[in-house]
Amino acid sequence: MKVTIKSIWNTVSAWHWDVNEECCGICRMAFDGCCVDCKIPGDDCPPVWGVCNHAFHMHCILKWLNANELQQCPMCRSEWRFKSDEK
C-alpha cells in the first residue's frame, strides 16, 4: 500500500486570558504568563477577580490573604471577596 501526502498543514495556536488589566497587581507578571510560583502558564494559574473588579493571579491573592490579617484588596483596600461568575 502506498500513501501520498498531498499537503502539509502548519498550525499555530495562541490563547490569552480575557482580563482588562495586563499584569497582576501583586507579582507584576503578565496574566498571559504565570505567577512567580508557577513554572508554566495555564489553567493552574488563572486570574481571579474581586468584587472591586481588581484581578490577580489566584496564587498571588491567596498568598496575600493568608499573609495579612485584614482581608483587603491589595489595590484599593476594600474588603476582599471573590467575584462570583453568576450574574
Swiss-Prot record:
<dbReference type="GO" id="GO:0045842">
    <property type="term" value="P:positive regulation of mitotic metaphase/anaphase transition"/>
</dbReference>
<dbReference type="GO" id="GO:0008270">
    <property type="term" value="F:zinc ion binding"/>
</dbReference>
<dbReference type="InterPro" id="IPR051031">
    <property type="entry name" value="RING-box_E3_Ubiquitin_Ligase"/>
</dbReference>
<dbReference type="GO" id="GO:0005680">
    <property type="term" value="C:anaphase-promoting complex"/>
</dbReference>
<dbReference type="Pfam" id="PF12861">
    <property type="entry name" value="zf-ANAPC11"/>
</dbReference>
<comment type="subunit">
    <text>The APC/C is composed of at least 13 subunits that stay tightly associated throughout the cell cycle: anapc1, anapc2, anapc3, anapc4, anapc5, anapc6, anapc7, anapc8, anapc10, anapc11, cdc20, cdc26 and cdh1.</text>
</comment>
<dbReference type="GO" id="GO:0031145">
    <property type="term" value="P:anaphase-promoting complex-dependent catabolic process"/>
</dbReference>
<protein>
    <recommendedName>
        <fullName>Anaphase-promoting complex subunit 11</fullName>
    </recommendedName>
</protein>
<keyword id="KW-0539">Nucleus</keyword>
<comment type="similarity">
    <text>Belongs to the RING-box family.</text>
</comment>
<dbReference type="GO" id="GO:0005634">
    <property type="term" value="C:nucleus"/>
</dbReference>
<dbReference type="InterPro" id="IPR024991">
    <property type="entry name" value="RING-H2_APC11"/>
</dbReference>
<keyword id="KW-0862">Zinc</keyword>
<dbReference type="GO" id="GO:0051301">
    <property type="term" value="P:cell division"/>
</dbReference>
<dbReference type="GO" id="GO:0097602">
    <property type="term" value="F:cullin family protein binding"/>
</dbReference>
<dbReference type="GO" id="GO:0006511">
    <property type="term" value="P:ubiquitin-dependent protein catabolic process"/>
</dbReference>
<comment type="pathway">
    <text>Protein modification; protein ubiquitination.</text>
</comment>
<keyword id="KW-0833">Ubl conjugation pathway</keyword>
<keyword id="KW-0479">Metal-binding</keyword>
<dbReference type="InterPro" id="IPR013083">
    <property type="entry name" value="Znf_RING/FYVE/PHD"/>
</dbReference>
<keyword id="KW-0863">Zinc-finger</keyword>
<dbReference type="InterPro" id="IPR001841">
    <property type="entry name" value="Znf_RING"/>
</dbReference>
<dbReference type="GO" id="GO:0004842">
    <property type="term" value="F:ubiquitin-protein transferase activity"/>
</dbReference>
<feature type="zinc finger region" description="RING-type; atypical">
    <location>
        <begin position="35"/>
        <end position="77"/>
    </location>
</feature>
<keyword id="KW-0498">Mitosis</keyword>
<keyword id="KW-0132">Cell division</keyword>
<dbReference type="GO" id="GO:0061630">
    <property type="term" value="F:ubiquitin protein ligase activity"/>
</dbReference>
<comment type="function">
    <text>Component of the anaphase promoting complex/cyclosome (APC/C), a cell cycle-regulated E3 ubiquitin-protein ligase complex that controls progression through mitosis and the G1 phase of the cell cycle.</text>
</comment>
<keyword id="KW-0131">Cell cycle</keyword>
<dbReference type="GO" id="GO:0016567">
    <property type="term" value="P:protein ubiquitination"/>
</dbReference>
